[in-house]
């Protein structure tokens, strides 16, 4: 019986070693660094990731975590350099190329962002955020036609992806096409009536088209959903300006006040 018990104990130890392999010091440092990064202690995370890399220069997790820490510290050149080292080790993940593209965008280099965002999309065509960032990059290098094509394709294939509507409308406003921008914002609120930024976009578009009564109406709708923000301050001020300039005798266009209720 004693022999059987000893054998059972030895088997248990072997099984534990198989199911719970010893973790390397590098791995343990990565776990610690990840915890620091998730706690937004980015400088401390950088040090832990660097230590992990010194112990194992082929650990993708350490390079990715280090790059993300640099990104949140706005040290984009260091993040870019780290991500380039990472994709030499592992070029199979769309996240790596996506983050590289985003860092290039953040560093004011949209032309370099484009190729990496395209690679991210080729690896994972479901990466909708990569497609959004690619559209932004094309807009920044004066290729608005390509941006528009990307937004339209996103809206066609992923009609619930509201960011595509919003970014497309914002780009159209920047181009001075306020009519088409307002149409796109209307498509957005059809999908989500609580998307308050769309009401502000509609109001500003009508404002620019000198459709002041409609502008006031949508500034008010925006304020119904969002009363306490810098944009709300702007909307109230603009309603008052338009009321005084164009509708001073029309009491139905009174100012929407901040507070618990909304005064029409």
Q: Each predicted region: which residue ranges?
A:
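Structural signature of tandem alpha-helical TPR/SEL1-like repeats
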Residues: 8-11, 39-50, 72-85, 106-119, ...
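Terminal, low-structured helical/coil segments at or just beyond the last alpha-helical repeat
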Residues: 5-12, 17, 216-264
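Start-of-helix register in tetratricopeptide repeats
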Residues: 27, 61, 95, 129, ...
């Amino acid at each position: 019986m004693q022999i059987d018990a000893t054998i059972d104990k030895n088997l248990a130890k072997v099984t534990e070693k198989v199911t719970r392999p010893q973790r390397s010091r590098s791995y343990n440092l990565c776990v610690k660094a990840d915890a620091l990064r998730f706690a937004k202690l980015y400088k401390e995370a950088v040090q832990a990731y660097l230590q992990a890399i010194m112990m194992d220069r082929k650990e993708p997790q350490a390079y990715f975590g280090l790059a993300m820490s640099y990104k949140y510290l706005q040290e984009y050149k260091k993040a870019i350099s780290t991500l380039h080292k990472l994709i030499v080790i592992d070029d199979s993940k769309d996240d790596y190329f996506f983050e590289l593209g985003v860092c290039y965008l953040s560093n004011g280099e949209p032309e370099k962002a484009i190729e990496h965002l395209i690679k991210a999309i080729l690896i994972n065509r479901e990466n909708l955020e990569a497609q959004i960032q690619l559209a932004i990059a094309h807009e920044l290098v004066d290729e608005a036609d390509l941006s528009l094509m990307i937004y339209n394709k996103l809206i066609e294939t992923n009609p619930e992806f509201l960011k595509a509507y919003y970014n497309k409308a914002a780009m159209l406003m920047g181009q001075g096409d306020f009519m088409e921008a307002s149409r796109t914002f209307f498509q957005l609120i059809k999908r989500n009536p609580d998307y308050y930024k769309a009401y502000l976009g509609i109001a500003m578009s009508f404002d620019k088209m000198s459709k002041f009564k409609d502008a006031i109406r949508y500034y008010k709708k925006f304020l119904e959903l969002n009363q306490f923000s810098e944009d709300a301050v702007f909307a109230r001020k603009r309603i008052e300006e338009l009321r005084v300039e164009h509708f001073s005798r029309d009491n139905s266009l009174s100012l929407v006040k901040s507070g618990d209720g909304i005064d029409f």
